[in-house]
Amino acid sequence: MDLMVPEYAYMFGFLQADGHLKQGPGQKGQLRVEISARDAEILRAFQKLTPYYSSVTGRTRPTNFAETHTSAIWTLCSLEARTTLNELGLPYGRKSKTIAPPDVEFSRRGYLRGLIDADGSVGFTSKGFPFVSLTTASTAIASCLCDYGKDATGAERSLKRNTRDGIYNVLYMMEVAQCLVADLYYPGCLSLERKHSAAASLAAWVRHAGSKPKPPRIKWTNDMDRLLLTAPTIANAAAELGYSSSACQVRRWKLLHDVVPLPD
């Protein structure tokens, strides 16, 4: 399972998000992935990638969201296969906070696409704006996407857990989302068909005439803060820094009211 091969990197990312390794007595155990039956083709693709016997089955049962839900289940019992996955970073049992990108060299693009297919979203908001997001409890996973997103699009994201459930929701919107999904979901890549279709639809979005992108977030430094505090007027500071007077006014207010720390 060479993770520099995009298909294996994708599969591993998907398994980290939606797979479950279970250990039994002795050397017994299994890898199990259960997803909606509409996405069963991805499990058959995993089956073809895996040189060990495995099965794809289905079941229908009631859930909290529907009276009947049909799912597809991929089951792999090989000890050698489970050992390989475990050593690469797929732990036994509960894993949401402990998973992390592999320590070996791997295809980041394939790996992140697998995570987004399993635990992310690609599409349009209720207002028709394109977006791509990933929900994860793992700091390492969230950091990996933020780093890749910066490399691919130039957009920076700060890591912050939701106060309600302690989960990270890394979100990209508008042109940045278009750029990122175009990079991740290239023609012929292994992916969920519905996510690939959604990614393709984002490419057709065009910003309304007269609507301008938000300016990039300002990264304030100690030198910039000192200039803000010592400049004779906000207008002087704005002209010196090259930012709007309103942005400089807000930052100065935060400095004077201890909302952010004063420069060293």
Residues covered by each model-derived region:
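Internal intein/HINT superfamily modules and their associated LAGLIDADG
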Residues: 1-264
